[in-house]
Amino acid sequence: MSSAVPLNVGITRSADSGASRADGEKRVLLAEPRGYCAGVDRAVETVEKALEKHGAPIYVRKEIVHNRHVVDTLTDQGVVFVDETDEVPEGALLVFSAHGVSPAVHESAAARNLRTIDATCPLVTKVHQEAKRFARDDFDILLIGHEGHEEVEGTAGEAPDHVQLVDGPDSVDAVTVRDESKVIWLSQTTLSVDETMQTVARLRERFPNLQDPPSDDICYATQNRQVAVKAMAPECDLVIVVGSRNSSNSVRLVEVALNAGAKASYLVDYAREVDPAWLDGVRTVGITSGASVPEILVRGVIDLLDEHGFHDVQPVTTANETLVFALPRELRAART
């Protein structure tokens, strides 16, 4: 599934590498697309509309999205973030985060008579449905993802007797299956495409009949942001990724930048976290942001770089995203 239209990259390349621009103008390469994806936009708006409709406090299980600024802003507005449903007063309103939850969490909420709104990204829900479908057909499901991530816990919880977590290529040797003719891989939606394909290749060496998911599990936005970073990284002395450390897709962007040729790459939540020493001798800085990052945080980094002489900002556009997800049915009438 994709909402992306391929576009020209449009980087004005130097004759040599970015480092050879020492006598030229400092510049910023600004990745497009970046920032909010459709699932994050839907999740954040779900909480905002729930506040408007029901008033504070409302409760959210885990972080609605993995971004410190978003969570802090919503907390200031009266949202209470909890780890588990037993922390929510009986009968209160609880929103499930964009990362999805297992059936056991739904059951726990119902047992406490909680009113619930599900802000799970529809692309995560798709993976849940795949897990249920292949479990019904008695497949061994190899779920590629990061141990402890909420999305992985939710997906695995749909079919705990059939799902095995595969946390990267190094985990492949420990995988065991019952019937090598009935094995399928699924994945967390926010992984590095390249590393996931490495893991799949290793799995296929062990299990030649390994089936692919019916459609891409890594979401369009994750892929698009990685493609944009790959396009600009070879020209960059430095790539700054705006995002939080618990954001899987943001962390992956740092890895992608380094693997694609950037000389250095750092993850920051705010412009104030940019170390001026990072800019010593730098002529080309790439900027991108994770899928849960509001644009105001990117603008803060651009303004900071402008103060350090990086006045020339060139967009690097590799796709145009148009996808919009409907709000949960409880709130659709409230959307403007």
Swiss-Prot record:
Disulfide bonds: none annotated. GO terms for molecular function: 4 iron, 4 sulfur cluster binding; 4-hydroxy-3-methylbut-2-enyl diphosphate reductase activity; metal ion binding. The keyword Translocase does not apply. Dimethylallyl diphosphate binds at H66, H99, H149, S247, S248, N249, S292. Isopentenyl diphosphate binds at H66, H99, H149, S247, S248, N249, S292. Its cofactor is [4Fe-4S] cluster. It catalyses: isopentenyl diphosphate + 2 oxidized [2Fe-2S]-[ferredoxin] + H2O = (2E)-4-hydroxy-3-methylbut-2-enyl diphosphate + 2 reduced [2Fe-2S]-[ferredoxin] + 2 H(+); dimethylallyl diphosphate + 2 oxidized [2Fe-2S]-[ferredoxin] + H2O = (2E)-4-hydroxy-3-methylbut-2-enyl diphosphate + 2 reduced [2Fe-2S]-[ferredoxin] + 2 H(+). The gene is ispH. Pfam families: LYTB. PANTHER family: 4-HYDROXY-3-METHYLBUT-2-ENYL DIPHOSPHATE REDUCTASE. (2E)-4-hydroxy-3-methylbut-2-enyl diphosphate binds at H66, H99, H149, T189, S247, S248, N249, S292. This is 4-hydroxy-3-methylbut-2-enyl diphosphate reductase. Binds 1 [4Fe-4S] cluster per subunit. NCBIfam families: ispH_lytB (TIGR00216), PRK01045.1-2 (NF002188), PRK01045.1-3 (NF002189), PRK01045.1-4 (NF002190). Belongs to the IspH family. It is an enzyme of class 1 (oxidoreductase). The keyword RNA-binding does not apply. Its EC number is 1.17.7.4. It comes from Rhodococcus jostii (strain RHA1). [4Fe-4S] cluster binds at C37, C121, C219.
